[in-house]
């Protein structure tokens, strides 16, 4: 095998890397978001049509009217993607459906196009825009419909078996054995009934028929004995039907008819029971005779029914070779038998099954019937009697040692529900609700004038779609911290959600890594915490097939020549189980044959050394095992998996920096992940760049047309980071389709660039890097190396209140002119203003609550005219820690035609941008799970420096490496230093990257010392440190956990309503909880006064804290504390239990507790006239202090008539 190590590879148009890969790429990575886009496209092309054809035609109860589906069409969307974002609207297109209403009595046909609501569209990036925010529909991992068998051991240690037929929707059918070897069935988790009762109910009533179908077995005999004929007046079938009905509907009068209808509806009605395509495929596959007969001994001679030729003799062992001969005959229905159920059974159609007799492996003398389901068509979506009989046969055969049990955690038994299918299921719910309405309207309205439009009520359909996008567990606000987070979110697989698991019920087995995950689901990338193993990520090469099973690609090995071909087969997990797969790093000769006689290979869960003539397939690439984020970790093979998990997860939390750098030591995944993430601006057609500036790129296509591309500038992302694109093409450059025209956030030259390449030394310094803390040079602050831009959005809306409309204005009560200096004439902050915490952004006043006016007040108001009502200041101010520069202001009003929610007259959005430099307390990390908090930022001159005088940037604690076992960071450090010296970028792909030799070879080439260490000098004294230190370049990222977001202090603030104690948490401007253990600490020190003030003034002594506040303001001594509110709550609780409890002081005089009624001052009535007079005088006195009003009575009498008119 030729070594490719050290060759140069081009990534995109602008970046070359020296790659250490030894294995050539046979297959390019697929489009990484196709799991989203392909699934949605399927839904638009086929899924919607399938839905309409399932539900329609709808017939009325008499069968006179029929509403049929003709066609559907999605019209042009109302808004573009950018407009939908700006207007807080949905990016959606109106769905129009053509329906035909046929009146069978008159033969009249009416066709009409009906509007079916706006249907959300997927953007090119694989997201949806709902209410202006980008959302992602996460794919769900669920158990596939099908028939499953499992072993179980009872409390006495006796082995038994169980079986479950799981539909896509409908009733479950379970079978189990008990300690007495009797077989039972349960329908939909109800009480169990003997297995033969269900067989009789299906129409095979007599014992003889049952033994004829299933053959003789001990379990079956025990079950038949248990199932006695109790009522001689009923036939066995009718009795079976009644027994089933009794279990399903206990307490209701049982008749054979009602039971027949019930069973028909439960299993054989396509509207109520649906196996789906995948269920039918799985059932046929499991009950297929070809796999079940393998390695058994025939108990009958098999004859070709057409020619009478003997195919296989009795007593033959059915090996692979024999089965190859037999397979075509089995497929053509060999040994099919037709059984006719009795007239009173559930299904009266004849049942065809295939029965082949074999000898039992447990008792070689005894014959056993193996029953196949006769291969129903793929179109049969319900379960059929033949399926039930064949699955019972499989279940009974298990006791004879024939067949095998299933592993429910195997990816052959778990499938993906992607966007398209999830939407389809939701749409079905809406259509089913609509169907009920249509039926009712058909019977009520006049058939002569009826049109499809009058029948249809689209509300349930619209509501179900809205509910799905708005509040489903799988519709998530997109993680947009950086492009890698975006990409990973779209490729996420969740086992939670409707129809899935719940966190509490999910055991260890479901969460564990399974051998079938290889190449399908990443064994590393999953969250830490309660969701571990329930939320996974799709592996880099994996695809989802039409049944929803994950497939992974393998290179086919030509068995005859022993050559590994370039032909790629995508295999699902259950098909892969039949093959032996060699690893991607197996050495090959020039002609593609294996270089060694024995290779490492996988056969199901085993890793074996096998001879090359047994190998069927070979892995495509070493990185097909892992997900995209994991594949971005260089030297992954040298890291412990727990740390690699943290490394993969933390890359998603990297904050986009002002001028990011792609890593010098990469893995070669940087370009592809950035290209497919949706954050880069990609060229749609070949052409030449005709114009380029910061906000627009124009490309002249080869056919002469002009394409315009808008470059996004400083848009707020979902997570409050700056989403900014910058062009990387130049004027006159020739560009091809799919080339990156502009970098998105966290990208450089088309590659993912989450952090910076910094000079790192592994050394301790004065204890400042204790417990993984990071010491940093001030250069990184000064040169804006780790500076990021954050944009926060604040909004204020003017609503209609009961007391009148709120008003956005500059005139705000009790606010000085200084505070209004940056507001415009409307009272809205100007763009570019620098604001601090507490500054005004939008001036707004709300009418003050005036209590209901009495008759006299209304009269006086009418006489003297409406005076200016009192208003409250409800302006929007900058919250704590939110200061910055006003980046943009958006104003939405009804007059301008903007859609606002009811009761809102005006909406103002203010965007404030912050430039955050790196800070002590910020969290940083490498790519190997090596995270820490910046503990000290030191002057550049105090940092240790290299012999050439270069000060290092960061000091990490060497003790963070050995116990964590992430040695990859040390290798990255050395290779990074060599790359820096040589001025090159390198790629070291996962599991196929630079070996130890490669690293040391590159170190030598760069002219570094043989151990890659160096002498460091103390920046303060200039003396060299004792030992040589590992210094090199490491890629470090700044994470979204920034100290500015967490810093919080409270003086006084809001209190809880009931307990009157301070609230908690930064969002509520709350306090720090002083809990039980903290109280013990103060008690232990005997700090009585400190303890007293913490439990009273600082907590819930309502009166005391107000008096204390006043005392501090006036500079008086602090008064004695009162009774805490929580004590009053306790007293009231005891009083409510009927205990007369009072509080006495030392002198045994009762202490009055604050009563709730004291607060309700509003309830005290005031004489209406005096109240009105007080309101009036304040204004009157200012204007007419000199004038005296004489003879008010005369005025009142004169104005009486006017008053009456006004009141009317």
Swiss-Prot record:
Cellular component annotations (GO), alphabetically ordered: DNA-directed RNA polymerase complex
Subunit text: The RNAP catalytic core consists of 2 alpha, 1 beta, 1 beta' and 1 omega subunit. When a sigma factor is associated with the core the holoenzyme is formed, which can initiate transcription.
Top-rank taxon: Bacteria
Keyword Nucleotidyltransferase: yes
Recorded coiled-coil stretches: none
Protein name in UniProt: DNA-directed RNA polymerase subunit beta
GO biological-process terms attached to the record: DNA-templated transcription
Organism encoding this protein: Enterococcus faecium (Streptococcus faecium)
Reactions the enzyme catalyzes: RNA(n) + a ribonucleoside 5'-triphosphate = RNA(n+1) + diphosphate
UniProt GO molecular function: DNA binding; DNA-directed RNA polymerase activity; ribonucleoside binding
Gene: rpoB
Enzyme category, top tier: transferase
Its job: DNA-dependent RNA polymerase catalyzes the transcription of DNA into RNA using the four ribonucleoside triphosphates as substrates.
């Amino acid at each position: 095998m030729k070594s490719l190590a050290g060759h140069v590879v081009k990534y995109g148009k602008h970046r070359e890397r020296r790659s250490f890969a030894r294995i050539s790429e046979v297959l390019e990575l697929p489009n990484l978001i196709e799991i989203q886009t392909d699934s949605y496209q399927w839904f638009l092309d086929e899924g919607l049509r399938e839905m309409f054809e399932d539900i329609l035609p709808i017939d009325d109860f008499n069968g006179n009217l029929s509403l049929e589906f003709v066609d559907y069409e999605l019209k042009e969307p109302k808004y573009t993607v950018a407009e939908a974002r700006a207007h807080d609207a949905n990016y959606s297109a109106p769905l129009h459906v053509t329906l035909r209403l046929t009146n069978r009595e008159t033969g009249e046909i009416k066709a009409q196009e009906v509007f079916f609501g706006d249907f959300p569209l997927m953007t090119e990036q694989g997201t949806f825009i709902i209410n202006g925010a980008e959302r992602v529909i996460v794919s769900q991992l669920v158990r596939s419909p099908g028939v499953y068998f499992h072993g179980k051991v009872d409390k006495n240690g006796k082995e038994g078996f169980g079986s479950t037929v799981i539909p896509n929707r409908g009733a479950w059918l379970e079978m189990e054995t008990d300690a007495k070897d009797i077989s039972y069935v349960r329908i939909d988790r109800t009480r169990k009934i003997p297995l033969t009762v269900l067989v009789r109910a299906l129409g095979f009533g007599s014992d003889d028929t049952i033994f004829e179908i299933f053959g003789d077995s001990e379990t079956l005999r025990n079950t038949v004995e248990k199932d006695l004929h109790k009522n001689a007046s009923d036939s066995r079938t009718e009795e079976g039907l009644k027994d089933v009905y009794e279990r399903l509907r206990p307490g209701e009068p049982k008749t054979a008819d009602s039971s027949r209808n019930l069973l028909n509806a439960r299993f054989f009605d396509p509207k109520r029971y649906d196996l789906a395509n995948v269920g039918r495929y799985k059932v046929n596959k499991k009950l297929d005779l070809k796999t079940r007969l393998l390695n058994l001994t025939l108990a009958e001679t098999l004859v070709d029914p057409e020619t009478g030729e003997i195919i296989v003799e009795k007593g033959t062992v059915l090996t692979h070779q024999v089965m190859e001969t037999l397979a075509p005959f089995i497929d053509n229905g060999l040994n099919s038998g037709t059984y006719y159920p009795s007239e009173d059974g559930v299904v009266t159609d004849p049942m065809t099954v295939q029965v082949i007799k074999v000898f039992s492996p447990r008792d070689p003398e005894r014959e056993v019937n193996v029953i196949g389901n006769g291969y129903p068509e793929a179109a049969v979506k319900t379960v059929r009697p033949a399926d039930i009989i064949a699955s019972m046969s499989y279940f009974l055969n298990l006791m004879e040692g024939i067949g095998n049990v299933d592993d429910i955690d195997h990816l052959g038994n778990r499938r993906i529900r992607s966007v398209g299918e999830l939407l389809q299921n939701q749409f079905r719910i809406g259509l089913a609700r609509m169907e009920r309405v249509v039926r009712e309207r058909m019977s009520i309205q006049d058939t002569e004038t009826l049109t499809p439009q009058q029948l249809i009520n689209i509300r349930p359909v619209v509501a179900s779609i809205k509910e799905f996008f708005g509040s489903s567990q799988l519709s998530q606000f997109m993680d947009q911290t950086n492009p890698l987070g975006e990409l990973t979110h779209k490729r996420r697989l969740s086992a939670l959600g409707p129809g899935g698991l719940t966190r509490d019920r999910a055991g260890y087995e479901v969460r564990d890594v399974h051998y079938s995950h290889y190449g399908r689901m990443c064994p590393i990338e999953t969250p830490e915490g309660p969701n571990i193993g329930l939320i996974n990520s799709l592996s880099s090469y994996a695809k989802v097939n039409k049944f929803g099973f994950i497939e992974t690609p393998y290179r086919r090995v030509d068995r005859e020549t022993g050559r590994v071909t370039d032909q790629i087969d995508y295999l699902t997990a259950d098909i892969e189980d039949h093959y032996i797969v060699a690893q991607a790093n197996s050495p090959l000769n020039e002609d593609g044959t294996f270089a060694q006689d024995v290779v490492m290979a996988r056969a199901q869960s085993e890793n074996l050394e096998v001879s090359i003539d047994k190998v069927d397939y070979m892995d495509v690439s070493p990185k097909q095992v892992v997900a995209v984020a994991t594949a971005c970790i260089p030297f992954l093979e040298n890291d412990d998996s727990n740390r690699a998990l943290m490394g993969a997860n933390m890359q998603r939390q990297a904050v986009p920096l002002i001028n990011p750098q792609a890593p010098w030591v990469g893995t070669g995944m940087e370009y592809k992940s950035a290209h497919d993430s949706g954050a880069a601006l990609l060229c749609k057609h070949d052409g030449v760049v005709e114009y380029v500036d910061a906000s627009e790129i124009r490309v002249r296509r080869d056919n002469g047309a002009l394409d315009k591309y808008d470059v996004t500038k400083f848009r707020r992302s979902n997570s409050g980071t700056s989403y900014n694109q910058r062009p990387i093409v130049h004027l006159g450059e020739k560009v091809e389709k799919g080339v990156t025209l502009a970098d998105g956030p966290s990208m450089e030259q088309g590659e993912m660039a989450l952090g910076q390449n910094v000079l790192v030394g592994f050394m301790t310094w004065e204890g400042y890097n204790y417990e993984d803390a990071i010491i940093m040079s001030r250069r990184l602050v000064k040169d804006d190396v780790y500076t990021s831009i954050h944009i926060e959005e604040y909004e204020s809306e003017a609503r209609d209140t009961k007391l009148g409309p709120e008003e956005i204005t500059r005139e705000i009560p009790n606010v000085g002119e200084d505070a209004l200096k940056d507001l415009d004439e409307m009272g809205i902050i100007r763009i570019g203003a620098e604001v601090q915490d507490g500054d005004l952004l939008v001036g707004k006043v709300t009418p003050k609550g005036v209590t209901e006016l009495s008759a006299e007040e209304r009269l006086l108001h009418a006489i003297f005219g409406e005076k200016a009502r009192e208003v409250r200041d409800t302006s929007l101010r900058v919250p704590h820690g939110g200061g910055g520069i006003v980046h943009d202001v958006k104003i939405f009003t009804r007059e301008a035609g903007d859609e606002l929610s009811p009761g809102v007259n005006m909406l103002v959005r203010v965007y404030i941008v912050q430039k955050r430099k790196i800070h002590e307390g910020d969290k940083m990390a490498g790519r190997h799970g090596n995270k820490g908090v910046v503990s000290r930022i030191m002057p550049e001159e105090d940092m240790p420096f290299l012999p050439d005088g270069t000060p290092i940037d960061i000091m990490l604690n060497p003790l963070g490496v050995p116990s964590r076992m992430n040695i990859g960071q040390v290798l990255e450090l050395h290779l990074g230093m060599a790359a820096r010296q040589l001025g090159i970028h390198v790629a070291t792909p996962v599991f196929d990257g630079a070996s130890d030799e490669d690293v040391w070879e590159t170190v030598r080439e760069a002219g570094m010392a043989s151990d890659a260490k160096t002498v460091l000098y103390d920046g303060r004294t200039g003396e060299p440190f004792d030992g040589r230190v590992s210094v090199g370049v490491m890629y470090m990222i700044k994470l979204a956990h920034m100290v500015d977001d967490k810093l919080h202090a409270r003086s006084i603030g809001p209190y809880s309503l009931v307990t009157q104690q301070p609230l908690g948490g930064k969002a509520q401007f709350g306090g720090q909880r002083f809990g039980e253990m903290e109280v013990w600490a103060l008690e232990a020190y005997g700090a009585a006064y400190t303890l007293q003030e913490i439990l009273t003034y600082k907590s819930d002594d309502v009166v005391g804290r107000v008096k204390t506040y006043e005392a501090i303001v006036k500079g008086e001594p602090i008064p004695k504390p009162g009774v805490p509110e929580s004590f009053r709550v306790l007293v009231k609780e005891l009083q409510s239990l009927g205990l007369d409890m009072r509080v006495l002081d030392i002198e045994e005089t009762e202490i009055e507790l604050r009563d709730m009624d004291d607060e309700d001052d509003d309830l005290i009535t005031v004489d209406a006239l005096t109240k009105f007079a007080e309101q009036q005088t304040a204004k009157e006195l200012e204007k007419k202090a000199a004038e005296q009003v004489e003879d008010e009575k005369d005025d009142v009498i004169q104005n009486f008539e006017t008053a009456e008119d006004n009141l009317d």
